[in-house]
Amino acid sequence: WEQRKLGELTTILSAARVHKEEWRTAGVPFYRSSDVMAALNGTENERAFISQELFEKLSAQSGAPQKGDVMVTGGGSVGTPYIVPDNKPLYTKDADLIWIKRNAEIDPKFLYSFFMSPIFKSYIRSISHVGTIAHYTIEQVKETPLLMPCSIVEQKAIGSFLGDLDSLITLHQ
């Protein structure tokens, strides 16, 4: 195992700004931290969308999330992860969701398990300012220490095992 900073392992970025007046009631899903929390809790929230034209313009500038990328909440309940499940068009709210691009060095399920761990939650508390609204910034994500197996095969095994365990616990609740 080795300790690395997350920013040493992959590209970490945020989407381009989308103004509220550009939101639509249908079109390309526009994810915010509330959508990640709803997915985690198995609940529904009021969804937001952007037009296909705006999506194409913004994704040409900054890219768009792809299957296996990990989104982590930067505002609200900071540090909550979401794995992009497929390559359907999706765009995210800048700074509200930090975008961690998938690559060959880190398994998304392992990374998800890390973000859900008590070690990470303790780290988030240590860098948050008491008495202010909590934020987890791109720079903080890049500096986040991650203890991880050197082998991607081992990461995948751990990530899959912990994911299966979470599913089993959820099933029996």
Model region roles, listed by residue range:
Residues 1-15:
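Non-catalytic DNA-recognition/assembly elements of restriction-modification systems
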Residues 1-2, 140, 144, 151-173:
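Amphipathic alpha-helical segments with low aromatic content
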Residues 19, 42-45, 171-173:
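Short, tandemly repeated low-complexity microdomains enriched for cysteine and small residues
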Residues 23-24:
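Short, glycine-/polar-rich solvent-exposed loops and beta-turns at beta-strand/coil boundaries
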Residues 32-34, 44, 49-120:
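A short beta-sheet element
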Residues 39-43, 135-137:
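Short acidic/His/Gly/Ser-rich catalytic and metal-binding motifs that mark active-site loops
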Residues 74, 90-98, 129-154:
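A short glycine-rich beta-alpha junction/loop motif
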